[in-house]
UniProtKB/Swiss-Prot annotation:
Name of the gene: cbiO
Described function: Part of the energy-coupling factor (ECF) transporter complex CbiMNOQ involved in cobalt import. Presumably responsible for energy coupling to the transport system.
Lineage: Bacteria, Pseudomonadati, Pseudomonadota, Gammaproteobacteria, Enterobacterales
Protein name stated in the entry: Cobalt import ATP-binding protein CbiO
Domain ABC transporter: 2-236
SUPFAM superfamilies: P-loop containing nucleoside triphosphate hydrolases (SSF52540)
């Protein structure tokens, strides 16, 4: 399990995370939302062991995180982070070499590396551009390479920071499909994003953060339907939730479901 217990973190004398109790093992996809400065990025860095809390703990497998070199190496093979800017974690001009970088550092046999790289590229739908130089790839393609680089570790938890930022509508749809495929393999995904519609559609549970504290937690439909909490957090409701709360239309999880239900209603009225 990956969780936090009374997690506090300060930058100098300024508390950024204030007593957070979170459990990411309960849901396949957990969304983290909040206004800028609420602590999402700092939380991600604590979960990955890049930062160490001054009080409380990050819990891995039910125990406080081991911050020794060996302990952090073990954690990062099971908890992988993909940053908002893929340039931060791409080091080679050759895609296969970049994705295989961490495995070669771990001494994984070449035959196993080849198999894992091939599987990761297939999962992120990158086989058709795997032989292109990385500098020639689009922003969205680089994001997929970065995700593939995390997937080859066979991590059980994947932390995605703004996975749809900078993507066009087609790229956003493709990213959602990739996340669903990752989850279908039995993995957990934690998404930090300002894309409220994404979080609503794909998450099974949502934490709303405000000034380093949990303002609300629960199922996406319940959380985002709470207008008062959304306003207090400085957030807007997903458009599907707005249609429900402001117009009384059925609460749907996806755009496809919404239009299907509207078509059924229109057909009934016409007949």
């Amino acid at each position: 399990m990956l969780a936090t217990s009374d997690l506090w973190f300060r930058y100098q004398d300024e508390p950024v995370l204030k007593g957070l109790n979170l459990d990411f093992s309960l849901s396949p996809v957990t969304g983290l939302v909040g206004a800028n400065g609420c602590g999402k990025s700092t939380l991600f860095m604590n979960l990955s062991g890049l930062l160490r809390p001054q009080k409380g703990a990050v819990l891995w497998q039910g125990k406080p995180l081991d911050y020794s070199k060996r302990g952090l190496l073990a954690l990062r093979q099971q908890v992988a982070t993909v940053f908002q800017d893929p340039e931060q974690q791409i080091f080679y001009t050759d895609i296969d070499s970049d994705i295989a970088f961490s495995l070669r550092n771990l001494g994984v046999p070449e035959a196993e590396i080849t198999r894992r790289v091939d599987e990761a590229l297939t999962l992120v739908d990158a086989q058709h551009f795997r032989h292109q130089p990385i500098q020639c790839l689009s922003h969205g393609q680089k994001k997929r390479v970065a995700i593939a680089g995390a997937l080859v570790l066979q991590a059980r938890y994947l932390l995605l920071d703004e996975p749809t930022a900078g993507l066009d509508p087609a790229g956003r749809t493709q990213m959602i499909a990739i996340i669903r495929r990752i989850v279908a393999q039995g993995n957990h995904v934690i998404i930090s994003s300002h894309d409220i519609d994404l979080i609503y559609e794909i998450s099974d549970a949502v934490y709303v953060l405000r000034q380093g504290q949990i303002l609300m937690h629960g199922a996406p439909g319940e959380v985002f339907a709470c207008t008062e909490a959304m306003e207090h957090a400085g957030l807007t409701q997903p458009w599907l939730v707005k249609l429900h709360t402001q117009l009384g239309l059925p609460l749907c999880k996806t755009e496809t479901e919404f239009f299907h239900r509207m078509q059924k209603c229109a057909f009934k009225e016409a007949s």
